[in-house]
Amino acid sequence: MEEKSSKKNDGGNQKVSFFKLFSFADKTDVVLMTVGTIAAAGNGLTQPFMTLIFGQLINAFGTTDPDHMVREVWKVAVKFIYLAVYSCVVAFLQVSCWMVTGERQSATIRGLYLKTILRQDIGYFDTETNTGEVIGRMSGDTILIQDAMGEKVGKFTQLLCTFLGGFAIAFYKGPLLAGVLCSCIPLIVIAGAAMSLIMSKMAGRGQVAYAEAGNVVEQTVGAIRTVVAFTGEKQATEKYESKLEIAYKTVVQQGLISGFGLGTMLAVIFCSYGLAVWYGAKLIMEKGYNGGQVINVIFAVLTGGMSLGQTSPSLNAFAAGRAAAFKMFETIKRSPKIDAYDMSGSVLEDIRGDIELKDVYFRYPARPDVQIFAGFSLFVPNGKTVALVGQSGSGKSTVISLIERFYDPESGQVLIDNIDLKKLQLKWIRSKIGLVSQEPVLFATTIKENIAYGKEDATDQEIRTAIELANAAKFIDKLPQGLDTMVGEHGTQMSGGQKQRLAIARAILKNPKILLLDEATSALDAESERIVQDALVNLMSNRTTVVVAHRLTTIRTADVIAVVHQGKIVEKGTHDEMIQDPEGAYSQLVRLQEGSKEEATESERPETSLDVERSGSLRLSSAMRRSVSRNSSSSRHSFSLASNMFFPGVNVNQTDEMEDEENNVRHKKVSLKRLAHLNKPEIPVLVLGSIAAMVHGTVFPIFGLLLSSSINMFYEPAKILKKDSHFWALIYIALGLTNFVMIPVQNYFFGIAGGKLIKRIRSMCFDKVVHQEISWFDDTANSRSLVGDALALIVQNIATVTTGLIIAFTANWILALIVLALSPFIVIQGYAQTKFLTGFSADAKAMYEEASQVANDAVSSIRTVASFCAEEKVMDLYQQKCDGPKKNGVRLGLLSGAGFGFSFFFLYCINCVCFVSGAGLIQIGKATFGEVFKVFFALTIMAIGVSQTSAMAPDSNKAKDSAASIFDILDSTPKIDSSSDEGTTLQNVNGDIEFRHVSFRYPMRPDVQIFRDLCLTIPSGKTVALVGESGSGKSTVISMIERFYNPDSGKILIDQVEIQTFKLSWLRQQMGLVSQEPILFNETIRSNIAYGKTGGATEEEIIAAAKAANAHNFISSLPQGYDTSVGERGVQLSGGQKQRIAIARAILKDPKILLLDEATSALDAESERVVQDALDRVMVNRTTVVVAHRLTTIKNADVIAVVKNGVIAEKGRHETLMKISGGAYASLVTLHMSAN
């Protein structure tokens, strides 16, 4: 962890050089970039040309003879048309070339990055990165890079040329005035630079805070069942709010600072106008300048200076892109220690399959303080089966990781056929090894595709044979789409047994020489296990096999059994040899497992029902993203973390039909009234902000008025000129100061209102989501912008428009109407321009969603990808998913280019029309010189003001949409609402549970009937064990008692009261749930145990609970003891260790009802005995419901109930049920007997 944080801190200074960004450009890109740059330079010069023409125009209007004037104006107006055509062409080329090349190059970088990530060694994933980071970089960082090397480069070139051109013209036309005005430029630049610098710092802080808040969301949603079962909703909400508070403070500070920056800039600009007017007048009087010349210089310097000010978005983008590229380019350059793409290394004709580990020393890169092997040796002769047994955490699975060469040993050798693994070509040797692990990883694609990972271009016949051999054909044929069924993210749509059989089929298809089985049958119930075991026996013949197993029954037949203890082999031999030595380690393990002879039947482990996302020890999969595991109603919309710029929100990938619904939902328009209502507490703040916004809004039209007055003034006689120039200069300064005060005030108040709103909405949403019956939610990315900034804009724009219109119509109503008719074009033009300044990249992100899903799946299952050498397969799939978005990006580039070009075309044509009609009006005496300019400036500046501010606004449609989705969340009342305080509570709970005629289907799989009219009574203080086949609905019983779901019909009663009438949070506090896949939070062991107790637990209680769960000893032996962080999803602990912590958490709650869902299935014999003892102690005097595979756990139950086809087929004690000949229970038991 420490390394990570230090990396974050120095991340700020690491950037690549600007030109390095383009290192992946090909020839086409170079051509596009060259054309784009030339066009951009050309486009940059249009504005300086425009000021020249404008100067001529003013002089034309300044002539006294009306007829002569009209002729002169016409001459100049034609030049506007030429300019319009020219600018249209260059603007199109500039934008389209740069956008297209940006899209192309970023696609290349994305592909290369994924390719490099897939080739990294597994250790890299343990220590350097995680899925979230990879996906974040692929979806977020590449967009920053694309932004820095696409349209922004063109824009920057354009602005730079405008700056240079403007100054060249100014110095050519009037060097004295230009020199004086230049002195103002540094001030403008400094203000702008300081603002963007501070802003980016603040934005960084805000993002960190939001990222942390996003993390809280991710963890909570990921573990929603655990949160809910332990009524941890309030804790989660509090933690979330504390993170939001930090983010809120930065939002307000950002508002204030951006306000000051903008205010200062505008103040400086207005003051320099004042200076220019006064000094210009002086030059006209003393140096013989004319009015056109002065105006020309003023405009040229200002366009030049303004364009320099507008470069900041580009410069920010360059900085962000260079920083983002640093990490990605580093990764692309990184050559892994163990490289799957490295084709050097020998390839043999064939291998025999002798495996040897020679004096191996090893530690996991992520836990360098724990030595796993110190001088470990093992030999596996070819064609033989060696089984590794031993306690949880002893290093059995590590042997498999070393043979697959996921890691290299620190010293010692791993040999195959006496050749060091390091000398063999990695891809080739992995193709000879088949791996079936305890937690089979499936990709979010079809069953057929999943199996085909085993072999390039496998035929349908081969796939068919593989599924038949793996005993998967039966269940696949039952599925509506057969082999084309989608398996869901990480295989969530399949039960454990089904997933495992697919994984085995995948290995069979590969037809490997060496087979590695890591707990391959631990997830199966008796029947599937026997079937799969047969399949594996078929698979194992004539292959070298290494088996890791908890269950000794599965390995009795192995040629050699090796007992691993604390990283050493303490005993090895065949089952029969070792069982002779009663004191030997093996015999002790066997005794532990059996308890007594007839219990050797214990491999009774019906697998949990359809709904379970399995995992024993999660050490292997640090899959960061996962759907809300277990049959949650959202198992389809798996949560993905999009580290969205504003809000690392949780984004939901729905299936198609969901998306259609989504769209319908989205069109529900949100009234601003409703949003405003949420903002009610901030009304005073909003009023102050609005007043400031109104004042700020009047500034632009007044500025137009001043411009025209001052132009008029330049043509007045010297005496009046002198007096007027002083007056107008002061007015400009006053205007500047107004801005300086009003903008920060406006931004600050709206920042507070907006920030509070977003904080309120986020915490409301989060609170709502946590209390949802396990449901999806959307991100609140842009919600703040709607009230905060959008309201400020609306007020400011209204003020701008009204003032502008008043000035124009009082000046000259005829011309005002003509210009007004054209002003929509000006608005469109300004909007388009500013939009290009802010960029288009947000859309790219959504388009690459599907491609990111492919990457996400591959990275979170990197071991599977590596062991099946499927890197190229993944890359092909990825490229395929990228094609659409890439083409789209190119299309977008061309369209935007055209739009940009035409917007310029319109602008210059409108100017032309305006002045020609003005000249006409003057000729017929309907207007004066001053009026023409008054109207023109008031309206054009009004239009520009409106359009720029609107475009800078975060897209309010987006904001409206997200508002709609937020209100959907806030309006949705969950059917099962844990936040509601309604419902009864009992003084004391006895713990009688009854299911009365319950029928049920999962909301997400309405075609599968789980319970039909199920009846079951569980007397208080007794233990009831549920057994049955995989998918029969045993775990569902537990989900229904916890009230994760309501029955479709029938009732569930506790102490004769229907559970739907109880207060939900109280009900859940009465129960302790320990599930098969314990979910821990990424915090310390201490806080994970304390999670069980609402209102906090004392240190003594925590230690007592840990002792009762047999966890105290191993916790104390860890370097940091109770302060050890368990890692994401508990990856730093072994399965048995996690399970004991989960039990301690349940014990601390001291529940009346104990629900054990496969609580010991993930443990090895010794931990199981220890944990089982702990459970036996806890079960006393509590009503206990146990779902289990193993007979030992079940035999002592007071009642055993067999769940079959959605009803209870039999119930009674073990002895009674055994007597029913041909009974369901007896046959389940016989199955086991024969399996042994």
Curated annotation (Swiss-Prot):
Glycans are attached at residues 542, 631, 653, 1082, 1181. Residues 593-616 are annotated as: Disordered. Residues 33-320, 686-958 form the ABC transmembrane type-1 domain. It is a multi-pass membrane protein. InterPro entries: AAA+_ATPase (IPR003593), ABC1_TM_dom (IPR011527), ABC1_TM_sf (IPR036640), ABC_transporter-like_ATP-bd (IPR003439), ABC_transporter-like_CS (IPR017871), P-loop_NTPase (IPR027417), Type_1_exporter (IPR039421). Pfam families: ABC_membrane, ABC_tran. It is found in: Membrane. Its main location: membrane. Residues 594-616 have a biased composition (Basic and acidic residues). This is ABC transporter B family member 9. The lineage of its organism: Eukaryota, Viridiplantae, Streptophyta, Embryophyta, Tracheophyta.
